[in-house]
Every structure is written in C-alpha cells, then in structure tokens.
Amino acid sequence: MVLHPLRGSSIDIHPNARWQQTGITVAGGNRQGNGINQLSKPCGLYVDDDQTIYVAERVNHRIVEWKRGATSGQVVAGGNGQGRGDHQLSNPSDAIIDKERDSLIICDRSNKRVVRWPRRNGTSGETIISNIDCVGLTMDENGSLYVTGFEKDEVRRYRRGESQGTVVAGGNRYGNRLDQLFAPNYVFVDRDHSVAKQGIVVAGGQGEGNDLTQLSYPEGVVVDQLGTVYVANAGNDRIMRWPKGATQGSVIVGGNGSGEQSNQLHFSAGLSFDRHGNLYVADQENHRVQKFNIEFNG
C-alpha cells in the first residue's frame, strides 16, 4: 500500500499527458555536499505556486528553498548541525507549507517530532507533535495534518489544536492485510477525506519487482483530479502512472537504469507537480531535484 502528501494546489492533468524524457536539474546537481549550491540525499519535496522548491535534506539536517531559475538555495530551517535544539533538525524527511500561517511544517524524524517553523527569517521551530516516528505528512484544506507513524505502522490525523490525533489508516500492527500498513513512508489526502477501516490497493500489491504490475520501494505519491496515481518507484528508478482502476501502470519518466544522466534517476524519493503539470523528482542518490517539463496536457 502506498500513501503520500498533497503537494500544493490540486492538479488537473490530462489522462494522455506526456512529459519530456530528459530532466532539467533545478536544485543541487553539484555532487553531494553541504554547500548552498549542493544537496545531500533530498527526500521530501514541496513545489509552491511560483515554482519555488522546498527540499528536506536528511543528511544536512536542513530544509532548503530554491527559487525558480536559482543556481543555489537558501536554508529556511535547520542547518545548525544535527541536534534536538529548537534551532536544529535531525534527519528531516519531509516539509510542507501552511500558507494560512505562512510557516513550514517539518517531519523532524530522528527527533521524533513535527515542528512548525516560520517561513520567512525563522531562526527556530516550535514542536507541535511529539513522540512520533514520522516520515511524511500533509495537510488538507481544513488545516488537519496527516502524519505517518513509521514505527507504529499507521497514519494519524491531527485536527487543529489536537496533540494526540486519531488513527485513520493502519494501526493494527504491521502486515499486508487491507487494514494494515507496513512501515508507511508518505501520505496523500484527496478532497474526499473519507476514513475507512480497510484500504484498497490502487498500485502494486503484486510483490516486489520491475514488471508494470509491480512496485519496488514506492516513495512519493501524488493523485490527480481523475484519481490517477503517480508513484516514485524508487527501487526501479522510475516514475509510474496508474489510472484509476488499472491493474498495471506505465512508466512516464526514468526506467533507463540507475544513473546520473538526464534521462535517468537513482532512487527517486519525493514527487511533486507544479500548477502547470510539470513534474519534479527528488533524485536522492544523485543529490539533485529534476524537473520534467510537460509536453502535452490536453
């Protein structure tokens, strides 16, 4: 079962949309490092309406902002060494924007907390959820947070002001039943907000592999207005599209073996679209973010 966050505004993508097969590096790409023009194992990815990219850098313990066309980024959270201080992060895995409060909300994974950090000129964060081994999170339009609990194999919803939250997926020990999850990474919430006792497999579920019916280490996921599922299939170094009700997916970018060429990926983690339908991928082991421009969108 695959779950992941809504990234920015909802997207309208034509069912026959195609993307350029060669990506453009829009963040990092200057080898692994902690310079402002470098990334180190980018994972969670958020693209704002103006195509500004926010990247969670696990190894550098920071969140960086890369504006459209920039050759270097700006640290907007963390970056003060690994630690538990209010001004520090430890292996952050995801970050989203709360536009209403003009702040970042960050999965500070190794500190087992979710923190809110002022988006502009913030020097420290505020812990809003404690004691949670979170990997991914998202927010619906009502301001409720959905956070994955990796250790407890569950997803919890936190309405505004709540500190405990409610289990909305999994929470029945780890396993492969439809009412179970196994080490969930990222979570996506659509506009339906329905909560069910059992899930429905919408992609994969046929064992690990590289057939079009299979996934291997699925990471980032986005769902469009038609219910089409887009999956960062990290273990196969490709991005796949699964139309609603489909029994197999199709490769939309990557799938050319693991590598650092512009048509290749190496453990694709985060996944996002901008409002035009252009695709962004956190290419983790290449320490870069790749943009694949949309060629056709109806």
Identify the residue ranges that each predicted region occupies:
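Gly/Pro-rich loop segments of beta-rich domains
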Residues: G8-K41, A70-S93, R120-D133, E162-N185, ...
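Structural WD40 beta-propeller signal
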Residues: D48, D98-E100, D140-N142, D190, ...
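Short loop/turn segments immediately following the C-termini of beta-strands
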Residues: D50, R58, E100, R109, ...
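Conserved beta-propeller blade signature
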Residues: T52-Y54, S103-I105, S144-V147, S194-V195, ...
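Loop/turn-rich, solvent-exposed surfaces of beta-rich toroidal or solenoidal domains
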Residues: S194-V195, L212-G245
